[in-house]
Amino acid sequence: MRQLTDHIVSADQAVQLEITVSDEPGAGGANHRYHIDWLGDTVWENAIPNSLDIHFQEGPIKEAGINGVTQEALLAIVIDRLRSFQAGPFSCRDNAVALTHCEEALMWLHRRTMARIKRGVEGTNRK
């Protein structure tokens, strides 16, 4: 298993989320299973479980069916949250720039999908 630390701000001394990659890379070179733990001594009212598993799509949808989430789905969630912060009292330049880059990332992934559809290879392991 491999730990991810890209989400940690080096100057932040607070308890951090622990992200673990819990599988081997697939045919495309990317992993599919991630586990997130958050630890803490305080049990909050209405608390949710202190871990989350994220399972990404394994294999082309046309061949394997839908069996996990996509980068696009997770980016859409992050974009929604950033748009909400920008519409509320926590609007700031940093959030605006982050939002723009997330929207741009989603646009490039959509562009890739559209090009694959045009070539007739979307949903397959073909280039």
State where each predicted segment sits.
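Glutamate identity and glutamate-enriched acidic tracts
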Residues: 18, 24, 45, 58, ...
